[in-house]
Amino acid sequence: MTVQLNLMVLENLQDPGNLGTILRAGEGAGITGLIMSRDTVDIYNPKVIRSTMGSVFRVPFFYTDDLEQTVLDLKARGIRVFAAHLAGKNNYEQEDYTGNTAFLIGNEGNGLTEKLSNMADTWVK
């Protein structure tokens, strides 16, 4: 049995409530895993745990020391990478997410770094 991968990839998220809410919403949308940069807030922060409403116990997660390399590895495995970006031409609802996908979300104040956002196949708003 082959499982479709729908990954959420977070870069330097700082607010515990935001991480928890993103994880909870992601689970509702069908993500199969969460990848976070090492400088993302601790997923075991009590505010994160509370705001996930249990999603933290159901969605596999991974912290990486090198998020850029991790994204390159995903792309090498045929995973299509989308980035939430203000310069995106299409609304996220207009894209086709069939097949293995990863969705990049950046820091609350600064968004994605330029280098990571340029690694995406598609920018969406």
Report the location of each language-model feature.
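Post-transcriptional modification and biogenesis factors for structured RNAs
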Residues: 1-125
